[in-house]
Amino acid sequence: MTLKIAIAGAGGRMGRQLIQAVHSAEGVELGAAFERKGSSLVGTDAGELAGIGHLGVAVSDDLESQKDKFDLLIDFTRPEGSLEHIAFCVANNKKMVIGTTGFDQNGKAAIKAASDKIAIVFASNFSVGVNLVFKLLEKAAKVMGDYCDIEVIEAHHRHKVDAPSGTALSMGEHIAKTLGRDLKTHGVFCREGITGERKRDEIGFSTIRASDVVGEHMVWFADIGERVEISHKASSRMTFANGAVRAGKWLENKANGLFDMTDVLDLNNL
């Protein structure tokens, strides 16, 4: 059976890439595409919006009217919109792939609660390469983390509204967990003025917002006399879109539960 996928935020940069990714993937088809209420894009053909030609799927601003046209919703929007979509999917037994970042603790708790009813893949980054980097960071932290300074540096396009990026925070969390540290306590997100000497157990974060940078992340494990750098650079959003579709296909036979790309890629068995 073909998995029918809906895309939230279809008119955005990521939404258009997701439409392309669904169209080119095997075993799935685009069932619906959504935009915010009153959007000028409502009624536009989703394929034409994404630059791949007519698909016969019109952009809608009403999930209820389209609920019989999809099995799974891919959502890369904003927290407030995603939470509305989560409530709808729980009420209508739809699976979800969530790539939205910037959720507060209440938002994350809502996702966890929803996963008791439906199957969800929730990840800060759907790139296969980035998720492999998460595992490499755990290995590096285990070997070097207690003996060096750790810094996470990330860069994104000027339109990104949250900082540090969800991926950078996930990198910090993987490192902190490996070292038995609490990122809330040991993470340093701003340095200005007279800061005093750096503490060895800090995990520092630096953010760059410029131009059209798709996404770059680098982690330093810096010791006296040597430094190990682990980095990832994305040159196209298609890497995230393809990963999200892969996650959706992986969810097809899952009834409920909260998963991430580590599960999708079976990275714990590396």
Swiss-Prot record:
Protein localization: Cytoplasm
Chain residues that bind NADP(+): R36
SUPFAM superfamilies per record: Glyceraldehyde-3-phosphate dehydrogenase-like, C-terminal domain (SSF55347), NAD(P)-binding Rossmann-fold domains (SSF51735)
Residues that coordinate or bind NAD(+): G9, A10, G11, G12, R13, M14, E35, G99, T100, T101, A123, S124, N125, F126
Keyword annotations: Amino-acid biosynthesis, Cytoplasm, Diaminopimelate biosynthesis, Lysine biosynthesis, NAD, NADP, Oxidoreductase
GO molecular function, one term: oxidoreductase activity, acting on CH or CH2 groups, NAD or NADP as acceptor
Pathway per the UniProt entry: Amino-acid biosynthesis; L-lysine biosynthesis via DAP pathway; (S)-tetrahydrodipicolinate from L-aspartate: step 4/4
Active site: H156 (proton donor/acceptor), K160 (proton donor)
Pfam families xrefs: DapB_C, DapB_N
Residue numbers binding (S)-2,3,4,5-tetrahydrodipicolinate: H157, G166, T167
Thylakoid listed as a keyword: no
Reaction catalysis annotation: (S)-2,3,4,5-tetrahydrodipicolinate + NAD(+) + H2O = (2S,4S)-4-hydroxy-2,3,4,5-tetrahydrodipicolinate + NADH + H(+); (S)-2,3,4,5-tetrahydrodipicolinate + NADP(+) + H2O = (2S,4S)-4-hydroxy-2,3,4,5-tetrahydrodipicolinate + NADPH + H(+)
GO biological process: diaminopimelate biosynthetic process; lysine biosynthetic process via diaminopimelate
Gene Ontology CC entries for this record: cytosol
EC number: 1.17.1.8
NCBIfam families: dapB (TIGR00036)
Cross-referenced HAMAP family: DapB
Family, per entry: Belongs to the DapB family.
Described function: Catalyzes the conversion of 4-hydroxy-tetrahydrodipicolinate (HTPA) to tetrahydrodipicolinate.
Descriptive protein name: 4-hydroxy-tetrahydrodipicolinate reductase
Gene: dapB
